[in-house]
Structures are given as structure tokens and as C-alpha cells.
Amino acid sequence: MSRARAVKKNSLVDAVVVPVGAVGRFGAFAALAGVAAMRLQWSVAEAIRHAGVLAMRCLIPVCATIFPFGAVIGVQGMAIFDLFGAHRLLSSLLSVVIIRELGPVLAAVLVAAQGGSSFAAELGAMRIKEELDATAVMAVDPVGWHVVPRVLAMVLVVPLLTILADAVGVFGGYVVAVGMYDQDHGVFMAHLVQLIGVYDLFASVTKGLVFGGLVGLIATYRGFHASGGAEGVGRAVNDTVVYSVMFILVVNYVLSSAMFGSGS
């Protein structure tokens, strides 16, 4: 009994200590990346190159995903609003749901799946091949040279894709409302801007910035600390996608509560 109790106690301790240690290591890694960025220990050309590749890889998936979301919201919204004779309010619903929430969240999730996994795989392969150690031996900061450009690429690309996702998602709803349900174009556009202002667009882009930094740090952290050969790289890629999606949703709730919780 005492041995079983000891095993149970150790398991409980591990369940608490291991996550806390992981959070601490991630925080230290993020701090190192921030210091390297402020000291300009990174290549602008590399950041731009990564941003270009990331944007091209994620452009079509973002558009192809957000458009049907907007269309589905349009179909369901018209079905509900028609019960009250208020179908003209569909564009107001679209603008709030997509611009405030779905646009930045879906853009970040797809970038995490497409670009974050790629960054984790690249850095994981470098770690396994000891290329990161070789960079340090050459008196070059591996965090500044390999991590910071990728994180900055995420911070740059996710807000841009968020703006695109907002526009494409609203257009998906427009196609349904005007093309399928014959809603007047002027009515749709008038109510589109009724509940959305500059603050909402700013909030959407701000979410994109935060999500981009979060995904970039998670992806580079998992890849940078990969171990165990090819299997370890695979785990790093899988963890990147899972943790990124999880924290995007949690942080989105926090940001939405802070930005819109007072009824703004």
C-alpha cells in the first residue's frame, strides 16, 4: 500500500511539476528571442524570405476555408432572420462574427498547420543534424539567426492574412445574401458597416499580431528543442499544431473579453 501511495504521489508531483517546467522553459526561450530581436541579431533578408514563402503557402488554404464559413453563416443567418423579417441584418452578423472572431482565428490556425509545422520540422531537422550547435560554434547566436526571422515572419504574415480572411469571409456571406436570396446590394452594404468600425478592424489585426507571435514562438520552440531523431521531429511538428490551436482559442477568448467584453 505504501509503495502504491508513493507511486501515486510521484505521478501527482510529475503532473504538476512537468507542465510548470515546460512553461518556464518556453518563457525563457521567448525572452531569448525577444532579446535577440531587440539587439538586431537577425537577418532582415531571412525574415522577408520566410514571410514570402509563408504567405504563398497559406494564401489559398485561408481563402478556401474562410469563404465557405462566410457562406454557411449567410445561409444559417438568413434562415433565422427570416423568422423575424430581419434578413437585412445578415451583413451586420457577418461583419461581427467574421471580422471580430473567425477571420483572425482561422487565419492563425491555418498558418499554424501549414507554416508552423514547417518551421518546427526545419528547426527540428537542424537540431538532429547538429546544425544549430554548429551555428553556435561559429559564434553566431542560433536563436537570433534561425528563430527570430521565423517568428517575425509569422508576426508579419498572420495579420495580413487576417485582413484577407475578413474580406473573403464577408464576401462569402455576400454571395449567399445577394446572389441566392436576392437581398439588395445597398441594404447589405449599409448594414455591413453598422456595427463595425475602425476599432473592430484594429482589434482583428491586433489579434493577428498576437496569434502570429504565439504560433511563431511555439513552432520554433518545439523545433529548436526537438530530440530523438526523426521520431522527435515528428513529435515536434505534431505538438506545434496541437498547442498552437489550443492556445489560439484560449488567447482569443481572453482578447475578445478584453476588447469587446464591455459591449463595445
Go through each PLM region and give its residues:
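Short, membrane-interfacial amphipathic segments enriched in basic
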Residues: S2-A47, R222-S227
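Membrane-interfacial helix-loop-helix connectors in multipass membrane proteins
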Residues: Q76-R100, A167-L209, G213, L217-V237, ...
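Generic alpha-helical transmembrane segments of integral inner-membrane proteins
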Residues: C63-A71, A125, V155, P159, ...
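Active-site cofactor/substrate anionic-group-binding motifs, chiefly glycine-
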Residues: H50-L106, L110
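Hydrophobic alpha-helical transmembrane segments of multi-pass membrane transport proteins
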Residues: L90-D133, L161, V215-I218
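Final/C-terminal transmembrane alpha-helix of multipass membrane proteins
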Residues: V233, D239-S256
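Short cytoplasmic-facing helical segments at TM-TM junctions of multi-pass membrane proteins
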Residues: L123-V148, A230-V233
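Selective transmembrane-helix segments that form parts of the transport pathway or gating/packing helices
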Residues: A55, L59, C63, L102, ...
